[in-house]
A protein has these predicted regions:
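A residue-level marker of the well-folded mature domains of exported/periplasmic proteins
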Residues: 1-272
Length: 272
């Protein structure tokens, strides 16, 4: 979001310099490469979009799926298609370097585009296009698991941790990040940790033009390898809206945010 704001304010990105990056209503376009249309990906791309929107309110996002967790060619093709449609920032929830590499190539060719990666630092792949990556710190779980076993305890089958435990975060900031990004990020992380900022604050998004006041979630575990899907474990139904926000990964570790919020469009056909 900060990079988008910077290049819009300094005149680098305008309707004249890159007209296809703005829709008919003047909203600036960003894109996202997703593996599958599962809650895990939907939750991630919605959080990404809301983060950008908190800095640049007039933003819309297009999502393209690859139907694969790791496919360099498809992820690269998805990024190329999104950028061809005008997307300026490309996020991802897919595991390869395909999207950042494609973004860097187009960036080198003069296109105004940048990458936010997933899992690992993408600066080596996209030295001037990579801004940062979302990442997991698995050391937190390894320490927990080892200590539990050494203490004679049983490992939980349903476990999650977040910013409070330093289990998630972002990688090194790239050289193209906007001035002041490090301080801004530190402030946001502090607010996430103390609870004063909620990722899915319902006052920050709408569904069908309406604020979301209720979101029942069925916590059953399903086997999606069968057709139709079958219930493996019958769970209870809970209300996910708690104190004005969607309480993601509170009632179980596996994500369950499946709302399609306004401002985001998903392409019906996966990248071939």
């Amino acid at each position: 979001g900060l990079k988008l704001k910077e290049i819009m304010e300094d005149g680098t990105l305008t309707a004249e310099t890159q007209p296809d990056s703005f829709d008919a209503d003047g909203n600036v376009k960003i894109g996202y490469v997703g593996a599958f249309s599962y809650a895990e990906v939907v939750s991630g791309y919605t959080a990404f979009y809301l983060g950008v929107k908190s800095v640049v309110p007039n933003v819309v996002m297009e999502v393209k799926y690859t139907n694969s967790w790791f496919d360099i060619d498809k992820e690269g093709a998805a990024a190329e298609a999104l950028i061809a449609n005008g997307s300026v920032i490309i996020g991802q929830h897919a595991d390869s370097t395909g999207a950042p590499a494609a973004t860097q190539k187009l960036h080198d060719d003069g296109k105004i585009c940048y990458s936010v990666g997933y899992n690992i630092d993408m600066i080596a792949t996209a030295p001037t296009a990579a801004l940062t990556s979302a990442t997991n710190n698995w050391a937190v779980y390894y320490k927990h698991a080892i200590a539990t076993v050494m203490g004679g305890g049983d490992l939980e089958q349903d476990w999650s941790a977040g910013y409070n435990d330093d289990a998630v975060g972002i990688t090194e900031l790239g050289e193209s990040c906007a001035e002041g990004t490090a301080d801004y990020v530190a402030d946001i992380e502090s607010k996430l940790k103390d609870g004063s900022l909620q990722v899915f604050d319902t006052s920050t998004f709408t569904v069908g033009g309406e604020e979301v006041t209720s979101a029942p979630v069925d916590l059953s575990f399903m086997d999606y390898t069968t057709d139709p899907a079958t219930v493996v474990y019958q769970g209870e139904t809970v209300e996910a809206i708690q104190d004005g926000h969607f309480a993601e990964s509170t009632f179980r570790s596996a994500p369950y945010f499946t709302l399609r919020i306004d401002g985001i469009t998903e392409d019906a056909e996966a990248v071939e």
